Amino acid sequence: MEIPRLLPARGTPQGAGGGGCPAGGGGVHRAPASLACQAPTRRLLLLRGAQDGGPGPRSAEAQRASRGLGPSLNRLAPRPDHRSSGGGRGGGAGGGGGGSGGGGGGGGGGGGGGGGGGSRGGSDDFFLLLLDPVGGDVETVGTEQAGAPVRREEAGAGPRPERRQSAGPPAGRPEPGPRCLSAVPAASPLPAAGPGPAAAAAAAAAAAFAGTITIHNQDLLLRFENGVLTLTTPPLPAWEPGVAPFPQPQPPPQPGALIAPQAAAAGFPPAAAAAAAAAAAGAQLGDCPELPPDLLLAEPAEPAACPAPPEEEAEAPAAAAAQSPRGPAGPGPGPGVVLYLCPEAQCGQTFAKKHQLKVHLLTHSSSQGQRPFKCPLSGCGWTFTTSYKLKRHLQSHDKLRPFGCPVQGCGKSFTTVYNLKAHMKGHEQENSFKCEVCEESFPTQAKLSTHQRSHFEPERPYQCAFSGCKKTFITVSALFSHNRAHFREQELFACSFPGCSKQYDKACRLKIHLRSHTGERPFLCDFDGCGWNFTSMSKLLRHKRKHEDDRRFTCPVEGCGKSFTRAEHLKGHSITHLGTKPFVCPVEGCCARFSARSSLYIHSKKHLQDVGAWKSRCPVPTCNKLFTSKHSMKTHMTKRHNLSQDLLAQLEAANSLTPSSELTSPGQSDLSGAELVSLFSDVPGHGSAAVLDTALVNSGILTIDVASVNSSLAGSLPADNNSNNHSLGQAAEPRALRGAPSDLPQSLDTSLFFGTSVAGYQHSPLDMDDVSAGNVGLFGSLALKNSSLEPQALTPSNKLTVDTEALTPSSTLCENSVSELLTPAKAEWNVHPESDFFGHEEETQFGFSHPTGSHGSQKDTDLITVTGTPFLV
């Protein structure tokens, strides 16, 4: 082993007589004053240990240097602050430091001291130069072999010829006090060379004391007896050296340096403290303070992972000493605190206990795959950094939940205390989620969100009274609709319209439903410029809220402020506050989601724009809807224009669903293709298929194929007929027609149809009894009379306009082909008193003259009315 340098006792003031100390030293250790003036003695101190065997190559050199027989070792220069008051060449070399192959020199007069050691050639050479605790010269000798006999003390009565000795205390040293005598207990006296004061002093100076020092992290027992220093390995350390802070910050210790802590360390006996003080420093004159407890050899400092900045010199010793497993020997943040620094780069964490540092180091090794604790169960590959985590993991295999919640009524248990603590926070923060609307509190955010939906949705004051049903509704009409589900077993009112199988629990509801088939909308909005009409009064009242700006349904969310006229609109708006998007685009490959149905509708139009070209247009003249397929157009006509399936089949067979490329304009819609045979049926008398389908009349869609007109329609068209100058589009009052039959012509010309004038028409009588009986097929529609007019398009109308000059009692129909759509005329009059279903409303009616006799006689004509309902409103 190697002891490079022996530091003097801390606290020796600079410039004091005798041995000095480095700057910032501690207390001064001095020998008894009564022994300082005696004749110098020679003590041979042997350092004994397990590594002291073998011949020391530097033993002779050290002995010669100590005795002054050889030259001084220049490389063992004394410390700059060491001074020796004794004479001789030995005093000049006292207090020197040892090197790899150096020796040591002794000081005279107890003023200097040093040690040295080295190794060369594989053999160890150790020697120790100690200041004489009782004064006089101290001689160092290298050990030669293990177990060598302890050399006896050599005492001389006078000074040696090689050195100058002083009979009294050196100049500048104060007289020592008597209280240091108790620090060195008396023991068996050493054998003296002769009687006299020197022998008595030697006997009094003999002392035996023991202590413990740590060299290279190994505790050694130090025993100083009869001038012999002995180091042995203890079987078991009886105590751990204490750590006390220094009175002031110190620089980092040098590698291998001996550190002398404060003498007032707890747990050290006074004798051991005195022995350590005597072994650590030379005896000096003056007062004797408390002695250090032991001598600690600091390890060579390793490079610190996070070196302290220069201004933090107070923390540098602790950071450097924390690299060792023992921890820092210097002061920490507070008195008696040991800090262990993590050696990993860029970590810098410190710990108060060594095992905490070990556990922390496992976290660094775990990132490199070093997890030593593995689950022993087969099939489980979990590994952990600590045994506690493995133990906690094994509880999960055993289904053990030892940590139960202490809250009454909870009953939950957990596998770890950490999970229990996390659960307890829920009880501590119970009802911490508060609703901003009603101030009600909830334990979790999920429950709060569920509660907030009740505020976003409108109130539902109407509850079902059926037994066992607790559903609530926003409006009373929704409640009535729901109640019908409970009365389905009762007698229901079924819709008799072909293709409709809806049933209702009340006749009034069926009546409202039938209006959707007939197109009747008796409830008209009376606001100027509106023109909307509805099938029920409730829908009309709901519509009037727009004109009155009655937005009774307001969003309850703070800061929103939106209001709506209908409850369902508010309900759809409330979804936007929930953050959900329930409306998904049905187009394949499109994952767009929306919170409102209206947003989805707007989005769906973007997909329709990708279609190359529109194929079909709605055949209703006032409807400009375009469709990509006939199926979508048929669906539109059924729902929007209330056309039956039979009528749609006829239109499809007549090829009336015309592509838009053939529709030049709404006013020139070519709806030809339907034969008269398919459009007119049940003609009495002559077998001519000329009875108009009433469904086509009611719908306002009339198509006539010019090429299919091959039947002889009796009638004549005089070339000089003055009625050609008039059109059928002029309105007339039917009451006036009924009151003045003489205004009506007695012959019905071919002004029912327009076309080329043909001479030589054959006349046939017209049986008006069939017309009065309800067969209005032949005159179900009135045509333009002027043949010079361009073809006109179908126009929606709910009134019939009758031109009195165009109505003639002619019973013959022309055989020429017609090439135009027939437009119903408009007329306004009150309905018959017996018509109670439609009420007072404007309806499509057709007026026909009803001659009671033959066409040749001048008789009064009666006007019959046929009620029709157009779907285009």
Swiss-Prot record:
UniProt keyword Transcription, yes or no: yes
Name this polypeptide is given: Zinc finger X-linked protein ZXDB
UniProt main location, coarse: nucleus
Compartments in which it is found: Nucleus
Keywords: Activator, Metal-binding, Methylation, Nucleus, Repeat, Transcription, Transcription regulation, Zinc, Zinc-finger
One Gene Ontology CC term in the entry: nucleus
Residue ranges with Low complexity bias: 316-327
Zinc finger (C2H2-type): 340-364, 373-397, 403-427, 433-455, 462-486, 493-517, 523-547, 553-577, 583-607, 616-641
UniProt GO molecular function: C2H2 zinc finger domain binding; transcription coactivator activity; zinc ion binding
SUPFAM superfamilies named in the record: beta-beta-alpha zinc fingers
Ranges of compositional bias, category Pro residues: 240-255
Annotated region described as Disordered, given as residue ranges: 1-23, 48-120, 138-184, 240-259, 301-330
GO terms under biological process: positive regulation of DNA-templated transcription
Protein family membership: Belongs to the ZXD family.
Pfam families: zf-C2H2 (PF00096)
UniProt region (Required for transcriptional activation), positions on chain: 645-776
Gene3D superfamilies hit by this protein: Classic Zinc Finger
Assembly behavior: Self-associates. Interacts with ZXDC and CIITA.
Function recorded in the entry: Cooperates with CIITA to promote transcription of MHC class I and MHC class II genes.
Residues recorded as bearing Omega-N-methylarginine in the entry: 89
Compositionally skewed regions (Basic and acidic residues) per UniProt: 150-165
Residue segments, region Required for interaction with ZXDC: 340-646
Gly residues compositional bias, start-end: 14-23, 85-120
Keyword Magnesium: no
